[in-house]
């Protein structure tokens, strides 16, 4: 702006001086000289002066044109300079804006680099965790498989033992029915003998004594049944505690949680869907399993009690009843000799032997049996429960008369359980 003012002031000053110079040239005193003397001598001088004036005017015109050209160029240069200054100011502003943008971008880039480093560290940590979870999932799957195998073995053992107990129950129920029939026959014979030998008071007293002994033995059997019931309940609770079903359920729940976590980490939708279905049905499965275990334990307890009803019957001494010979009845001499040799309970082969065979004591799946032919394998020995040394609850299997020993087919498959099945000969 100052350069434009200078050019305007210089042009305004140049114009009046030029006009004054031209007026002075026109009002020169050389034109007013009219004397003749001077015209002759000074004509040359005048001409030379006129020539000089013309040259000066030409140079003045040239200078004016040059000055005007220079002024126009100066104006153009000043306008360009003003435009350049404006552009310079704009560029400075743009430069400042770009610098601020660059600083912001640089800060953002540093933040992104920091975030990238944090994300890379987190990625490495998550990768390590994923590797650990994969290893843990493999280990848990192996543990789950081993537990399922143990559970299958125990189920097979339990089923085989339950089958053997059912066979024992059927066998002893048949024996008891036979004994009841024989007792009924003996009661009929006793009533007949009482009618025939009503006069014999000594025989009646002996019969009453035997009946009292029999009643005492029945009471003893009831007390023994109550004791065995308590002992069986203790054995069942002890076996269930060592079976530790709740720990298996907790292990199953832990495995399901690990599988779901691993599937979420790996984004496995199919596995998550199947696992959610398993988790949704887990309560029903657990309740069904608990009910099955409870019913099996109760049935085992009932079978054990029914099979031990006639286990510890005391031998009863029989008193021979002798008939007083009747001299008037000659036809009964042959029968009297047979009646003299007949015992009161000689009709029962089991009672006449003096003792009743003991049945197999009830044991739960996995209980070590001393009557086993083979030694338990390493896989089944871990699940076996060591029984106590109480003789009344000893898990040894005794074979009653009329029962043959047969090895279950599960012994050949698994090699860790041998069950004696009863077969009536």
From Swiss-Prot:
Topology relative to the membrane: Peripheral membrane protein
Keywords: Coiled coil, Endoplasmic reticulum, Membrane, mRNA transport, Phosphoprotein, RNA-binding, Transport
Record-linked InterPro entries: She3
Effect the entry attributes to changing residue 361 to E: Prevents correct localization of ASH1 mRNA
Annotated GO MF terms: mRNA binding; sequence-specific mRNA binding
Cellular component, GO, one term: cytoplasm
Compartment(s) of residence: Endoplasmic reticulum membrane
Note: Present with 1010 molecules/cell in log phase SD medium.
Family the UniProt entry places it in: Belongs to the SHE3 family.
The protein's name in its UniProt record: SWI5-dependent HO expression protein 3
Organism: Saccharomyces cerevisiae (strain ATCC 204508 / S288c) (Baker's yeast)
């Amino acid at each position: 702006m100052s350069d434009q003012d200078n050019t305007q002031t210089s042009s305004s000053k140049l114009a009046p001086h030029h006009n004054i110079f031209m007026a002075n040239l026109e009002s020169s005193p050389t034109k007013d000289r009219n004397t003749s003397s001077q015209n002759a001598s000074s004509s040359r001088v005048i001409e030379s002066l006129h020539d000089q004036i013309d040259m000066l005017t030409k140079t003045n015109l040239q200078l004016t044109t040059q000055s005007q050209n220079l002024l126009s160029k100066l104006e153009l240069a000043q306008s360009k300079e003003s435009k350049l200054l404006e552009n310079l100011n704009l560029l400075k502003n743009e430069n400042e804006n770009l610098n601020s943008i660059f600083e912001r971008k640089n800060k953002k880039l540093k933040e992104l680099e920091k975030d990238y480093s944090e994300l890379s560290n987190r990625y490495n940590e998550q990768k390590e965790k994923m590797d650990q979870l994969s290893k843990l999932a493999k280990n848990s799957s192996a543990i789950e498989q081993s537990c399922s195998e143990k559970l299958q073995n125990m189920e097979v053992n339990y089923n085989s033992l339950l089958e053997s107990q059912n066979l024992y129950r059927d066998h002893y129920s048949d024996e008891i029915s036979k004994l009841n029939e024989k007792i009924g026959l003996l009661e009929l014979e006793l009533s007949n003998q009482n009618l025939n030998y009503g006069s014999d008071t000594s025989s009646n007293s002996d019969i009453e004594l035997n009946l009292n002994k029999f009643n005492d033995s029945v009471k003893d059997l009831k007390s023994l049944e109550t004791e065995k019931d308590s002992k069986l309940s203790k054995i069942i609770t002890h076996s269930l505690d060592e079976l530790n079903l709740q720990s298996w359920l907790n292990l199953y729940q832990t495995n399901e949680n690990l599988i779901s976590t691993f599937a979420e980490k790996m984004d496995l939708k199919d596995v998550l869907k199947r696992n959610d279905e398993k988790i949704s049905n887990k309560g029903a499965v657990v309740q069904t399993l608990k009910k099955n275990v409870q019913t099996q334990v109760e049935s085992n307890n009932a079978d054990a009690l029914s099979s031990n009803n006639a286990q510890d019957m005391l031998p009863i001494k029989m008193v021979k009843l002798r008939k007083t010979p009747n001299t008037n009845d000659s036809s009964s001499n042959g029968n009297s000799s047979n009646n003299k040799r007949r015992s009161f309970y000689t009709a029962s082969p089991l009672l006449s032997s003096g003792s009743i065979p003991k049945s197999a004591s009830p044991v739960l799946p996995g209980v070590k049996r001393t009557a086993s032919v083979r030694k338990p394998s390493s896989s089944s020995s871990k699940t076996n429960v060591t029984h106590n040394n109480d003789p009344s609850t000893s898990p040894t299997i005794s074979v009653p008369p009329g029962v043959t020993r047969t090895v279950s087919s599960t012994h050949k498959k698994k090699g860790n359980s041998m069950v004696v099945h009863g077969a009536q000969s």
